[in-house]
Amino acid sequence: MAFEIAYDGPVTVTFDTVAQGYSRDGCTVRIQPFWNDVKADYSGGEQGPPADTQFLGAIATVNCDLTKYELATVERLASTFDYGLTEGKVPLPGTLMRQEAKMKQLKLLGTKFTTTFETAFVRQATEFNAGVRAKFFRLSFECWMADYSATRILMTLVPTP
């Protein structure tokens, strides 16, 4: 079962060391763990409840609605992954995000805590309500555990100085 962490208040979003913008309403982080149920004869076999469960890792989905941003800066997120700035163009099929170094660091600088994900990529980057007075830019990131088998770090959370 997934769980969510809500960051209330202002959050500055930095991706690949570039400040993408500011979210006055905070961001949400959804942690999704992966499990494998282990069956055993003494607990009913395949039809019974698991005798144990094995943790297989976790990913985080981060959603930020930027209310203050430079459009040119956030549009560059698409070109980071070979999208280019041409609408409708997608990466080459078969592109491996981690193996081809397309994953970057994501940092959420909040009023109380700074959260860092070392391995993240953009899932969605869309401007909403363009052309009207109130508009925002929605960024959705997917974050994976660090590619260091000894550490298995998904994110670090430290008090904001």
Predicted regions and their residues:
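Solvent-exposed edge beta-strands and adjacent loop segments
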Residues: 1-74, 114-136
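Low-complexity, intrinsically disordered/propeptide-like segments
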Residues: 18, 80, 109-111, 160
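Residues on the solvent-exposed faces and adjacent turns
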Residues: 33, 110, 145-147
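Beta-strand secondary-structure signal
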Residues: 61-65, 105-107, 138-142
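Residue-level recognition of well-ordered secondary-structure positions
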Residues: 65, 87, 91, 142-144
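Charged, amphipathic alpha-helical segments and their flanking helix caps
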Residues: 75-102, 152, 156-161
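Acidic-leaning, charged glycine-interspersed low-complexity segments
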Residues: 88-129
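Short, charged interaction patches at domain edges and termini
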Residues: 117-161
